[in-house]
Regions:
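N-terminal "arm"/small-domain region of PLP-dependent enzymes with the aminotransferase-like
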Residues: 1-58, 150
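Short acidic capping loops at alpha-helix termini that bridge into adjacent secondary structure
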Residues: 77-81, 102-104, 187, 206-207
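Conserved C-terminal alpha-helix-loop-beta "cap" of PLP-dependent enzymes
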Residues: 285-291, 299-310
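PLP-dependent aminotransferase-like
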Residues: 97-156
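Short beta-strand-to-turn element immediately C-terminal to the catalytic PLP-Schiff-base lysine
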Residues: 35-37, 225-232, 302-303
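Short loop-beta-helix segment that forms the pyridoxal 5′-phosphate
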Residues: 59, 71-93, 108
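PLP-dependent aminotransferase class I/II
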Residues: 207-286, 291-293
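Active-site pre-lysine segment of PLP-dependent enzymes
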Residues: 120, 137-149, 162-183, 187-217
Length: 310
């Protein structure tokens, strides 16, 4: 293919590839080990919903019933929620809605790669603030960059992927107050942390956008159900770049069935995951040459001094 056909911003990109893994136990994708359809009540609810939803009809383009259920879960209004085909689509919608070519997008590193990739696709200028030694986030420099650059978007993964660290809500508020533009807080792993959501501050900040997902604590990664939470005018703006029918009837039904039994699902999934995480962290640090870092997520980042030897 003639590469001149491509947008100039992606000509140097390499295709995103997920490596083939032959092992039966896969832990590098931070997936849940629990199948939502192993819950009889959820499975029955899901099948009942599908039986009432003909496949020849297009899905509800705004997933109104699902928005209401998600709003009830996170304690906001339905009009403050927008659903997407996974958190990845929500990230893409945010960037496509707000970022022009040349606009600055501020991130901390290491973090979820998709923030920078999506920003570069539209020609954004990605500015990164690297962690301090020990994967401690450089909060002082990051806040200074927000004040200095006034980025078009500031993106914070909290808890962070891949380090597992979390920033307090008080610091996130400092960033929100310092920025005249949207600040995106990705809370994909929040259910494992025990910390309250920044969504509790939604009414105070018109520049706050929160990303949530049902992939991790609920175990719906294969069904792709992410959502944004923001004040209504921001949700309305994000809807301008959304595909009309972006969420199929299967995912909507699964999301509703899961949320109808959310307390049971979370009680089953989250405490054992936290216990396994803490056990793994402790045991890894007993191995010579291995350093595991504290985590509030469902994974543990580790450094191996001599990888080939291990």
């Amino acid at each position: 293919m003639n590469k001149s056909w491509l947008r100039s911003t992606i000509r140097s990109f390499e295709p995103y590839k997920v490596p083939e893994i032959k092992e039966n136990i896969v832990i590098n994708a931070n997936e849940s080990p629990y199948n939502i359809f192993d819950f009889p009540a959820v499975k029955d609810d899901f099948l009942a919903r599908l039986a009432q939803t003909p496949s020849y009809h297009y899905p509800d383009p705004f997933a109104e019933e699902l928005r209401a259920a998600l709003a009830d879960y996170v304690s906001c209004k339905p009009e403050e929620v927008l659903v997407g085909n996974g958190g990845d689509e929500i990230i893409s919608l945010i960037i496509n809605t707000f970022v022009n070519a040349g606009d600055t997008v501020l991130v901390h590193t290491p973090t979820f790669d998709i923030y920078g990739i999506d920003a570069e696709i539209v020609g954004g200028n990605v500015v990164s603030v690297p962690d301090l030694p020990g994967f401690k986030r450089d909060t002082k420099t990051f806040l200074a960059k927000v004040k200095e650059l006034q980025p078009k978007l500031t993106m914070i993964c909290n808890p962070n992927n891949p380090t597992g660290s979390i920033l307090p809500v008080s610091y996130l508020e400092e960033v929100l107050q310092a920025s005249a533009n949207p600040v995106v807080i990705d809370e994909a792993y929040l259910e494992f942390s025990g910390q309250e959501s920044i969504i509790t501050k939604l009414g105070q900040y018109d520049n706050l956008i929160v990303i949530r997902t049902m992939s991790k604590a609920f175990g719906l990664a294969g069904l792709r159900l992410g959502y944004a939470v923001a004040q209504q005018d921001v949700i309305d703006a994000l809807s301008l770049t959304k595909l009309v029918y972006n969420m199929n009837i299967l995912t909507q039904a699964a999301g509703l069935a899961t949320l109808a039994h959310r307390d049971d699902v979370l009680r089953h999934n989250v405490p054992p995951t936290i216990a396994a995480r803490d056990y793994l962290y402790t045991e890894l640090n007993k191995i010579d040459g291995v350093t595991a870092y504290p985590s509030v997520t469902n994974f543990v980042l580790l450094h191996v001094a001599d990888g080939p030897a291990m």
